[in-house]
């Protein structure tokens, strides 16, 4: 929130919301570095590992939005019990790299590559920890946006066997929403 304007976005007065948004912005940056290093195995692997770690962090950022410390602590502990063994397993048995799909999307080969059943179960659990805090805190816009993104991800996975590569759409849509809210709604309707 800029100190030089009378219009403020109340949603962004929480440091955890900034961290939550930054997780999407950083993912866009990491994907850029994967794209420019797609043919360099070392850098491809490094940036794919960073993308994987950021994906692991996103539900934590979402859980931190919860105001009730008891619920927050319970969800964080549950998520860590799930994600730590899965992360060790993924990093131990798989070569982390990305490639270009048949429709020219970025394919994170470590995400869904060996056992689809367990990968889908893992994705559903990840999704619960990512979306439940938005529902619990009644962040309706964020929850609706998350569900819309889920539908697009599902369609993209069905069509191209890729699940990521939509971060720039997500970030730009969020920023367009906040720009319209700040520049059009607040000055004329508040």
State where each predicted segment sits.
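Alpha-helical transmembrane segments in multipass membrane proteins, preferentially the mid-helix core
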Residues: 2-3, 61-62, 107-156
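Alpha-helical transmembrane segments of polytopic membrane proteins
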Residues: 44-56, 112-126, 165-175
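Membrane-interfacial loop-to-transmembrane alpha-helix junctions, especially the N-terminal start
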Residues: 8-21, 72-77, 137-146, 189-190
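Structural signature of transmembrane alpha-helix termini at the membrane-water interface
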Residues: 3-7, 26-37, 60-64, 87-94, ...
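Internal transmembrane alpha-helix with an interfacial aromatic "cap," most often the third helix
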Residues: 2-6, 26, 30-45, 49-79
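C-terminal transmembrane-bundle signature of multipass membrane proteins
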Residues: 136-190
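Hydrophobic alpha-helical transmembrane segments of multi-pass membrane proteins
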Residues: 19-34, 150-153
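Membrane-proximal helix-loop-helix units in multi-pass membrane proteins
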Residues: 62-129
